[in-house]
Structure formats: C-alpha cells, structure tokens
C-alpha cells in the first residue's frame, strides 16, 4: 500500500491455569519451530499476514484517520480464525478486516492437557499515514480478560478482568473527566453524536475498546483481596444469557477550609447493583447513605436551597444530590437513590426509565439541560438513524418552596424535552432543542399533549392556557477541525421580541443564554492532555416565570447552568492522565448579579423569583443588582485504584474569591482555601464552583 505503514501489537490473552499451556497455535511456516519460540513465530506470522492483506478503505484515507483499529478474534478447535469484534467507527474497515481474517489459512489449534482448545487474541492495528517505512512493528503482550475452556474438564481458566457492562445497554457514569477522554474517540468517527449524555456502552464500543483500555491498567494480583481491590467487581455472576455485578460505593473525604469549622468531611457508603438479561435489557441501581459537612461557603449555599422546613425540618439541599436533614453539629444527612432500566429493542431505539440525571451539550456547563440539580424520575427515548439522533425526555420534577407546599407534600411539576442532533457533514453537527414545563394544576397530572414526540411545545403552551406551561427553545452547533480540535456553542431562547432586539434598548423580555467553547485533545502532541476553554452567559430573568413553579428548576436548583441567570462566566480546564495517575485543573471566573438583601425587587439572577417583580422593562443588563465578581480555582491529583469500579484516591485544593459590590450579612467578601483528600467511587461530579 502506497504511503502507508501499519504497526501492530499482537496481544495474547493471559490465563491462570493449574498447568501451563502445552502448545501455542501453529501458523503456516512455524511447523518446524521449537516450542519455546512458537509464540513469537505465531505472532509475527499472523501480524505480517494481516497487515499485508489489508487494503485501507478510501473513507479512512479521505478522513485522514489516525489511531488504532482493535480486532478481537479467536482460533477455534478446528484451527479457524473467527473475528469477534472490530473496534472501528468505519463499517468499511470492519468489512475489510473480516474479509482478511476469513482468508487466513487454518492453523494447528492450541493445546492444553493434550486437548485442542480455543484461544482469544487482540490485534490493535495502528494506522499512521506517511509513516517511516523503516519502523519495525513492536510486539507486546497484554493481560486481557477472556476465558480459555478446556474441552473435557469444563475448566474456566481466568485471572483477568471481566467487565461485562462494556457490552451492555448500561450508561457510562457521567463525569467530565471520563467523558473528555471518551469524546476524543467519538471525534474520529464519521457519524458520531456527542451532545446527549450519558452514553450507553453499546454506543461507546463503536469508537473505543474500553476492554483494551482497562486491561492495560490491570495489576497482576494472585490473591482474592488484591484482585477485588485493584482490578475487579466485588461480586460477579454470569450465566448463559444473564449477568450481575455487586459493588460497594464509598465517598470518604476529609479536609479543612479557613473558616471556624474544625474540619470538613463526607462519609458516603453505598451499594451498586447492575446486570443484564439477554442482550437487549440492562439495569443499574445505586443507593448512597451519606453524612457530610463541607466548606463554609458550600454549607451556606446548601442551606439557602433548603426545602420547606414545615415539610420535615430539612435544613439544606446538598447541591446536585438531594434534601438533607440535620446531623450532629453543623452537618447533614442526605440519602440518595438512583437507578434505571435500559432496553434496546432494535438498532434504532434505546428506551430508558429511571431516577437519575441527564445532560445535553458539548460543554462543561450546559445552557439547555445539565446535571446540576438532584436526581429525578425520567423516561427517555433515543432514536438513531441515518445522520440523525433524536432524543425525547420526559421528567417528573418538584418545587419544594414553602409557598407551594401543602400538608407537607411538595408541589409536583413536569418537563418534556426533545433534542434533534444532525450530522450535516462529518465535521459539522447542529442540534435543535425544545423544552416545556407545566405544573400539576386542576389535577392535570402528566398532560398527554406533551407525549407527542415531534410537536412544537410553544404551540401547546398557548393552547393549554396562559398558565399552561413555560416553553424554551435552543440551537446547538459543533465543528471538528480535526480529530483533536473542536468548537461548540449553544443558544437558549426563553422569550424574545424581534423588534426590541433590533432597538438594543435592554428589553427585559429578551431572555436568552449563550455558550461558546473549544476543546483540544492530546494537546500539543502530548497524549492524554486535554484542554478546554468556555464562555457562558445568561441575561437577567432567563429561566424564570411569572408563576415561579413553572421556572426551569427542580428542588430549588437550576436545570441548566449552576449560576441560574444574570451572569457572565469564563471556564478553563486541563486534564492529564498517565496510566492510573491523573490530574485536573480548573479555573472559573465570572460576574453575577444577585438580588439586594432586604429588597423585594427581582434583579433577574434568582430563577425562583417572579419576573413581574422586575426592576424595569428597559435598560436591563447582565450583572445588575448586587454585582459580584466570583473566582474559583481547583486543582486535584489522584490515583485510580480500581478500573472496574472507578475507585480513586485523590487530594485537592480549592480557592474561591467572592467579592460582592454591596456587603451585608448575606453577602460578605470572602476568600476561601479548602484542602481535601479522600477515597471515592467516581460515579458523578461534585460541582462547587459557584
């Protein structure tokens, strides 16, 4: 092949058996090789045969593809090559690889205890264009999680990592660090959609081999304790058409800020139960029992979100987690439960029903739908075909303010969202967003009008009455300059009047939010270095409503940006990973307008205030009210203890400067330094950058 050189790593499955493998498979040309050299001969011959036979598809050349195509295959007891998986976003490459392996000659199969056995292998083929033809293929072994079955004894021989969830309909838990790593592989695909999160593992495996990634991190351990601590799920059961895993969850943190608090801590213990029934149905459930006391500014913020105390004496809502009750002195007890069912009846549809969170966007923040609020019940339908991914999402939310709480029961509200993602070209993606919120008034319940997956919600808002609902629309875009660099944006429109926009008179009703950002994967040719810069802004009164129960919120938290509205914000992020070690750095700087203490006027920063209490109809500008400059810097380093459960050791420091223009007992100028260390199962992000 012209101007093309493949380097390949031929990876042998490692097995733990009561005896050593008697004989490696014998490829054509290796018949006379001594047994001790047979493995190297086999790997070299197969690698050469595959590389020399592959004709690189035009699509890869056109897209200037660079990266690995991982081929998982096995040699059966008859000596025939069988391809199990080709990890490539290009179907043409998959077809070509399967063709090549089907044409390989039969070999003498491997032997164990004098019986022919199956053996499985992974062959990652690295494809750099215009590489030096003088380079030599580098052959290495890797511990890979597969089983070798001995024919007569029925013995399963394995000491390596089995991650069955990687081939299920479960979601990869959403954290910014994990998804920034995954997205770089999505960017190499010709028809990937990255905005709707979390991703299912079946979506991810089209672009990246998670098994190979995590097996590369595996520690060689012979004891049960060592394997469970560093490599495996605590409990795993697998049958012919089902599997289950059971793992403990911990989030144990201790720290100190520069306030009068003796120390900060978080003590979370929990359990996660996951599984699959057949190939189409998967489930996950997690329960967390937690007690904690945080840095003083976080405690104050949590108490400012407190639910109606008459409904049960709840002093706080822990940001992103849920309602808390008092625990000992200046601490909180906050249980959280999450879970969902995921069902994929065919290649076009995925259905999910559960109690968790969702995210729409390509940024660190989202102006459309974020994971800032507490978990909520939802039903989601993802439909994928051609260059389209269409998401319908129905959510059951709560308003926990005392004004709407009756007999200790919180007010129920509902939200329906749909998002259309279209890959216009391989590099350009655009998205259309629409969402509506309505309350359970007049025993209205879940209004069937909003079950239509393709209706325009703004029309329904008017057809169901002036207080029928609150609709928002949005537009997104993402452009990939190449596999490593991309830019993205969001435009959110709550309300607007075209004539007033043209006049530029600061009309209050032009309520909108905007985001623009850029990502740089493997920045400056440093592998696993990720950089991101982002700007977010929302005009005053965005996401609010004259009937506050119809605002864009849940459990006294914004369903979009953490800061609500009436702000400008800049975000800079750097992530770096080396093996099991990682480091993250984040800087957030912005300006936000708060309401003035003792003043009932709404300045547009609190989405739970009635916008009819606004300052004026014109001259409305971002930062009005108690203008406050906010700076948050966060640095964290850590070590991944267990790739299967994402258990991490970490230490970090957070610095926060909060500088309001008008000082009061509620708004004080503060400089906070918060040191923290801990051990946690990293299944979600803590967002304390407010």
Give the positions of each predicted feature.
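Exposed, low-structure sequence patches enriched in small/polar residues
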Residues: 334, 428-690
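Generic short beta-strand segments
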Residues: 105-106, 248-254, 654-656
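Residue-level preference for beta-strand/loop junctions
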Residues: 63-67, 117-119, 265, 333, ...
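Outer-membrane beta-barrel channel domains
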Residues: 149-429, 436-440, 503-512, 519, ...
């Amino acid at each position: 092949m012209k101007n093309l050189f493949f380097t390949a790593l031929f990876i042998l499955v490692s097995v733990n058996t009561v005896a050593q493998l008697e004989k490696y498979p014998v490829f054509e040309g290796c018949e006379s090789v001594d047994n001790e050299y047979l493995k190297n001969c086999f790997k070299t011959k197969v690698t050469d045969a595959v590389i020399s036979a592959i004709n690189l598809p035009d699509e890869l050349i056109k897209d200037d593809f660079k990266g690995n195509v991982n081929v998982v295959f096995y040699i059966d007891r008859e000596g025939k090559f069988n391809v199990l998986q080709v990890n490539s976003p290009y179907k043409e490459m998959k077809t070509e690889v399967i063709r090549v392996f089907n044409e390989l000659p039969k070999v003498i199969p491997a032997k164990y205890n004098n019986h022919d056995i199956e053996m499985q292998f992974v062959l990652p083929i690295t494809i750099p264009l215009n590489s030096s033809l003088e380079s030599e293929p580098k052959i290495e072994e890797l511990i890979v999680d597969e089983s070798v079955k001995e024919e007569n004894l029925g013995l399963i021989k394995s000491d390596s990592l089995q991650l069955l969830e990687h081939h299920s309909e479960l979601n990869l838990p959403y954290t910014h660090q994990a998804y920034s790593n995954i997205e770089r592989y999505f960017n190499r695909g010709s028809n990937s959609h990255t905005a709707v999160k979390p991703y299912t593992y079946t979506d991810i495996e089209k672009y990246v081999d998670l098994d190979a990634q995590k097996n590369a991190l595996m520690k060689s351990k012979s004891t049960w304790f060592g394997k469970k601590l560093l490599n495996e799920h605590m409990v795993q059961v697998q049958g012919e058409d089902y599997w289950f895993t059971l793992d403990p969850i911990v989030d144990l943190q201790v720290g100190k800020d520069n306030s009068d608090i003796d120390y900060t801590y978080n003590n979370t213990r929990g359990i996660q139960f996951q599984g699959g029934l057949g190939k189409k149905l998967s489930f996950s459930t997690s329960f967390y029992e937690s007690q904690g006391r945080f840095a003083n500014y976080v405690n104050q913020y949590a108490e400012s979100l407190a639910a109606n105390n008459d409904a049960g004496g709840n002093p706080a809502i822990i940001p992103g987690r849920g309602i808390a009750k008092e625990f000992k002195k200046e601490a909180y007890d906050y249980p959280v439960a999450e879970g969902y069912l995921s069902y994929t009846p065919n290649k076009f549809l995925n259905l999910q029903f559960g109690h968790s969170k969702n995210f729409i966007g390509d940024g660190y923040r989202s102006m459309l739908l974020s994971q800032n609020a507490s978990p909520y019940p939802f039903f989601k339908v993802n439909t994928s075909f051609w260059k389209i991914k269409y998401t319908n999402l129905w959510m059951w939310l709560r308003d926990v303010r005392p004004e709407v709480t009756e007999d200790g029961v919180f007010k129920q509200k509902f939200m329906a969202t749909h998002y259309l993602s279209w890959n216009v070209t391989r590099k350009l993606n655009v998205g259309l967003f629409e969402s509506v919120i309505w309350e359970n008034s007049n025993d209205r319940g879940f209004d069937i009008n909003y079950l239509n997956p393709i209706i325009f919600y703004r029309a329904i808002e008017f057809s169901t009455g002036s207080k029928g609902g609150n609709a928002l629309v949005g537009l997104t875009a993402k452009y990939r300059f190449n596999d490593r660099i991309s830019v993205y944006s969001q435009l959110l429109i709550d309300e607007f009047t075209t004539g007033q926009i043209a006049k530029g008179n600061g009309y209050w009703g032009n309520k909108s939010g905007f985001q623009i950002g850029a990502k740089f994967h493997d920045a400056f040719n440093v592998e696993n270095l990720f950089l991101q810069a982002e700007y977010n802004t929302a005009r005053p009164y965005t996401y609010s409503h004259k009937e506050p129960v119809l605002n864009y919120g849940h459990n006294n938290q914004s369903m979009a940006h953490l800061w609500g509205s009436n702000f400008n914000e800049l975000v800079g992020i750097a992530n770096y990973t080396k093996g099991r070690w990682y480091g993250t750095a984040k800087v957030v700087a912005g300006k936000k307008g708060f309401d003035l203490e003792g003043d009932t006027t709404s300045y547009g920063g609190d989405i739970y205030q009635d916008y009819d209490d606004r300052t004026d109809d014109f001259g409305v500008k971002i930062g009005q009210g108690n203008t406050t400059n906010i700076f948050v810097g966060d640095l964290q380093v850590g070590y991944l203890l267990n790739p299967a459960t994402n258990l991490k050791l970490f230490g970090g420091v957070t610095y926060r400067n909060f500088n309001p223009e008008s000082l009061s007992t509620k708004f004080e100028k503060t400089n906070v330094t918060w040191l923290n260390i801990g051990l946690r199962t990293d299944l979600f992000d803590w967002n304390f950058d407010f």
